[in-house]
Amino acid sequence: MSKRRVVAPLALVASLAAVAVLTSGALAKPAEPQKSESVVKLGFITKFPVDFFFTLQNAAKKWDAATPGAKVLFAQGKSATDDAGEIAAIQDMVAKGVRGIAITPTSPAVSKELDKAIKKGVKVVLMDNDIPSWKRKTSVVATNNLKGGVLAGKYLSTKLKAGDQLGILEGVPGVPALDARVNGMLSGLGSLKSQIKVVSKLETDCAQDKGLSAAQDMLTANPNITAIYSACGPPVLGLVQVLKTQGKKPGDVIVVGFDALPDEVAQIKAGWETASVAQFPAKIGSLGIATLYRSVKGKKVPKNVDTGTALVTKANADQFGG
């Protein structure tokens, strides 16, 4: 009798437990369906910390925030010649599983590391400057630097005359985009090229401090120089410092730059810089990362995207800030 009293309650408990399990399964919230595709991880690498590349980054960050299907990892080198820094960033991003890298290459030296990334299925979009000899990139999103240089040269041809002296502050010799800015400028001079004298050509690594020292050497050796062309924006700021130190007045030396950075535009307004070729870094950044994303998603993208140039002078400087 006592045995039956024990068994009945146990059977009842087991029965209730079974009902509870079934009921909880029926009332439980259905599992959310899995996303058909995971978020695409992309890398975005820029050369070094100056306004131009910060603008590229900020544009890519805005795109990233507005694109839920993507996650962008950012890295930046220390200088215009920091090949090692970019190579390390490429390696790090590949290790973190990016499916694509958008990069402003410091030089052709980084292409070997990009080849390794491509072998692992990573797409590569070059921004700001091309590596013409390297054919494995998916796309190039950049200023046409040769055309920009021609624009500068044509402008200089309206300011110079036969017999005038021209100095050139190069960027990083051997970097195709920067060389194109110089070659384009010389081409843009047209027939005047053979009538003027290029008295000095010095490299600056696109750095303000190196631009300052190069400008000191150039102006000391050529005190009667008529014009100076700079293939990058930061060296112009160093040049302006030298002009002021040497007691020059705005306009004494024709100064034409490339980049039209905010600080350059301020010098254009003040009369120290005569003109600069403007790029559109925000456009490069946003189109660069968007083009990369489309290619990773299997969409067809153009091999080249020209983001345009414009000549900035005192007449239109207000349109470019500074």
Regions from the PLM with identified roles:
Residues 3-9, 27-322:
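A residue-level marker of the well-folded mature domains of exported/periplasmic proteins
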Residues 11-21:
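Bacterial N-terminal signal peptides
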Residues 23-25:
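N-terminal signal peptide c-region/cleavage motif recognized by signal peptidases
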